[in-house]
Amino acid sequence: MANLEITYCGVKYRNPLILASATPGWDGEGLRLAAAAGIGGVIPKTIGPKQDWAAHPRNGRIFMHRYKGRPIGQVNLELFSTMSRDEWISKELEIAKKGGAVMHISILAMPEPDETAALVRQIQETGFADLLELNVSCPMPASTVGMHIGKSAERTYKQVKAGKAAASIPFTVKLTPNVTDMVEIAQAAKEAGADGVTISNSIRSFSGVDIETGKPYMRGYGGYTGPAIKPVIMRHLTEVARNVDIPISAVGGVTGFHEVVEYIMLGASNVQTCTAVMWNGYGEITRIINDLNNWMDKKGYKSFDEIRGIALKEIAPIEELALLPPKFAKIDKSVCTNCGICEKLCFYRAISEKNGIRFADKGRCDGCGVCTQMCPANAVVLE
């Protein structure tokens, strides 16, 4: 049987799955339930002072986007923990600790670095925190916190520097995807002393408009999460993993063991999940871990060290890929159902039908691969 244990920033986890800072961990009992389901680590909703600018709406703050009835993502107007710092310190962290998972505590980067340092000291003095995760990345906060700090390498550096100086346990920082170049921000965090980075928080977004009423589904800007954001997260993850030597916790779009493996193959040390639990409950944690264990055994891997970062070397610039020999669509006639989807979607007009059989013309095929992705029978390949 594979050993699912991993080490992140010097702390050992029983498996690489972590409950991200979000609604399922809004209190100590939620974190304890996640731990009871088998998760390796838990992160509470971001802890900070109870201020007016930290309050979130209670009149509907989640809007789910669907494609053909299937949820693909959601916009949320969640901010930070609605429990006060004192409630977490006096009661909730102790409840969460009873679950037995690693306690990776999310704290808010305050408007001034010295305020952040004070919060760091308050949380770690409880003795319940194993690591700290500094939130400089919430996509819809007041103008002095969240991504307004994390979009700036200079402000991120100052916050991490102050927090790390006050910390006696591993200190990490959660980055924002709402930037052009995350590498610059991650490098600044490393230079300031961060032990690790989380990639990443949600994407600033808008829910949309009900065209029957002309009113937005939700009136405020929110954070987009779920499966639809995974390609964006993978882009940031790979760029940082290839350019900054720092442990990474990946989060965004994890709905099963497959994404856990993908993120680790792209350089992540561990992987956080939120939406899967929000959509399916804490039992989803157990399913993902069991599936992960079965996959590792099936592949013959003994530990995640064997696969961590193995996909990074395959990434290449487009100009290099353009020099590779072209490939052309080939239709397996024994599998093809003659549905015609490939022909309808081929804008190079390379696919045609004759006597009930579909053919691909190499002279017209441009090797885009759309037909291979859209064929419901998996009858088309590029070769």
Residue ranges and their predicted role:
Residues 29-33, 115-122, 179-192, 242-243, ...:
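Catalytic cores of alpha/beta
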Residues 2-7, 27-101:
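Glycine-rich, positively charged N-terminal anion/phosphate-binding segment
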Residues 52-70, 208-222, 276-301:
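C-terminal helical cap(s) of enzyme catalytic domains, especially alpha/beta-barrels
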Residues 73-74, 139-154, 185-242, 246, ...:
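Glycine/Thr-rich beta-alpha phosphate-binding loop at enzyme active sites
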Residues 44-49, 135-140, 196-206, 253-254, ...:
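Glycine-rich phosphate-binding active-site loops on the catalytic face of alpha/beta enzymes
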Residues 67-150:
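Active-site beta->alpha loop and helix N-cap motifs at the rims of alpha/beta catalytic domains
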Residues 341-359, 370-383:
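Iron-sulfur cluster-binding cysteine motifs and their immediate structural context
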Residues 22-24, 106-110, 175-181, 246-258:
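Glycine-rich beta-to-alpha transition loops that act as phosphate-gripper elements at the mouths
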